[in-house]
């Protein structure tokens, strides 16, 4: 580590690179006070990069990477913390702050504040006892259920929705299993006058399963299966099953920082329709194959992600679907960042479209999928922040913590 043999009068300057929904910045600033926090990454001595992954038990695995810059250039450390699903937000932030504090001590000992820092160790009461493997009566299975609803009503219109889901997961180093079911109900009503009213109802149901076998640090094999129904897609019943294989250019253990995954699968889809389709079908069974590639990377300069998906029916390759997407959040220079997301799909596989013409109400209320050959979307934003680089003070009065910035989106 640069200047490791000398102490500096300057405090360690730290840049926290962590989404606000993962890190409680005010809490960290009040709990870890032996460093200075800066708003600009290039002004920092230590860039703290936080990434996460979901664990098999429903918790969150944090990877905390401390990257030395300026006087600590070349220093690199990685810390891990697993937050249990049952943790409260306070328990998680306390543990996260404790681990981050330990990581920052490595740098702070090279400042004049070193004499004020102490590290303690709480010796377990039964330290002499041999370690016993933890017994898991659930055998790594995690179950969850979710139900929610909302309504919004006015004199001439009202909206209501109900959603429910069930999930069962089992994740080990060798296997990954997931079973999920969900149902959605959406209703919209519009009253034009005392005698005219439009009502739109959309229902959908899905049952999905996934089994994945770990082969190596770069290869996996899996099986997708599912059943669904959707009034929007004219599908009374839809079934699919397809085995697949996946390859990652980078070892899976690096997935919180970077991934380049390629997946290919071949399978069968079966459909039963509510109404006769544009191809005069009420039911059909078709073989298909699908290929997808996805890339993501998060570094101190920002994050990028993108991918492409393509699928077609083997009996009629002309019935196909291809899509690409790209997103980025880049810190271009001091105080200035750019973020955008875009996607495009070429669509030629809408075999489910009903033959009869849609009414004006169906179109306006989006009650049924309409024919299209493409789908495109874009969002972009710029952010510029300037002023004092130091960001140590927490002042919760009247809400918020102050600071001026300029934001523009298009």
What is each stretch, according to the model?
Residues 133-140, 173-176, 214-218, 233, ...:
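Short loop/turn motifs that connect adjacent beta-strands in outer-membrane beta-barrel proteins
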Residues 10-14, 133-153, 174-179, 260-268:
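Transmembrane beta-strand segments of Gram-negative outer membrane beta-barrel proteins
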Residues 149-153, 172-174, 183-189, 225-231, ...:
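Transmembrane beta-strands of outer-membrane beta-barrel pores
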Residues 143-145, 177-179, 221-225, 241, ...:
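Transmembrane beta-strands of outer-membrane beta-barrel proteins
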Residues 139-141, 158-162, 201-205, 237-241, ...:
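Residues that define the transmembrane beta-barrel architecture of outer-membrane proteins
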Residues 156-161, 190-196, 234-241, 272-280, ...:
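Outer-membrane beta-barrel translocator domains and adjoining extracellular loop/strand segments
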Residues 145-147, 164-170, 209-213, 227, ...:
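Residues on the lipid-exposed face of transmembrane beta-strands in outer-membrane beta-barrel proteins
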